[in-house]
């Protein structure tokens, strides 16, 4: 079981308020408003090109809105707040030649975890997702579905205050989807707001 004692922060909520993002003549996001409440899992549905990824990038600070704002528990979000977000981007950013466990430990240490804590937590998630036997393998040697699970695992490490996951279930088999959903439900039970995107409406339901 993942150690829940790490979850020491007061639960936060996130609000997207009148967000607009234009790329020259194309308006990708137009006056968007929604809440990601503390302790809730929010599904973000839409076809490719609907603005899901653009919106997530604005929340985590990768893109600057044309106008509008992101609120963190009722106040404008800061760079320090954003450092506590567990983010899984649309573009998978794993280092293909690095062993899985080394990569996860490195990413967790960037977020402030100690080496021992990072290694313990990473191995617990790998075991839970059926990947413990692959911990020393290079990422590039894993199937795409297993790489997806590693990418999600990276976002879960180091006690994130908020989870923003872009297509986390893409390419996963039903068993892996259930395992991933169970972990996300546990996070929401701890008060963590979770936003995930999907083009599969059955997953949103």
Which residue ranges define each predicted feature?
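Helix-to-loop junction immediately C-terminal to a conserved catalytic motif
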Residues: 60
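Conserved ABC transporter NBD signature motif
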Residues: 68-81
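Conserved ABC ATPase "signature" region
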Residues: 105, 109, 117-134
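Conserved ABC ATPase signature
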Residues: 138-142
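Catalytic Walker B motif of ABC-type/P-loop ATPase nucleotide-binding domains
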Residues: 163-166
């Amino acid at each position: 079981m993942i150690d829940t004692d790490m979850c020491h922060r007061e639960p936060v909520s996130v609000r997207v308020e009148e967000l607009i993002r234009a790329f020259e003549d194309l308006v990708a996001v137009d006056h968007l408003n929604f809440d990601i409440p503390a302790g809730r899992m929010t599904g973000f549905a839409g076809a490719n090109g609907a603005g899901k990824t653009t919106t997530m990038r604005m929340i985590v600070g990768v893109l600057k809105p044309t106008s509008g704002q992101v609120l963190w528990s009722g106040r404008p979000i800061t760079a320090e707040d954003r450092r506590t977000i567990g983010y899984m981007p649309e573009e998978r950013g794993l280092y293909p030649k690095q062993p899985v466990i080394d990569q996860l430990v490195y990413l967790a240490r960037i977020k402030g975890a100690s080496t021992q804590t990072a290694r313990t937590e990473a191995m617990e998630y790998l075991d839970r997702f059926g990947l413990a036997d692959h911990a020393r393998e290079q990422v590039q040697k894993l199937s795409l579905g297993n790489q997806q699970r590693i990418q999600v695992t990276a976002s879960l490490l180091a006690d994130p205050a908020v989870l923003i996951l872009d297509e986390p279930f893409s390419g996963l088999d039903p068993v892996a989807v259930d395992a991933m959903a169970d972990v996300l439900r546990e996070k929401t039970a701890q008060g963590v707001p979770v936003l995930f995107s999907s083009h599969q409406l059955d997953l949103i339901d």
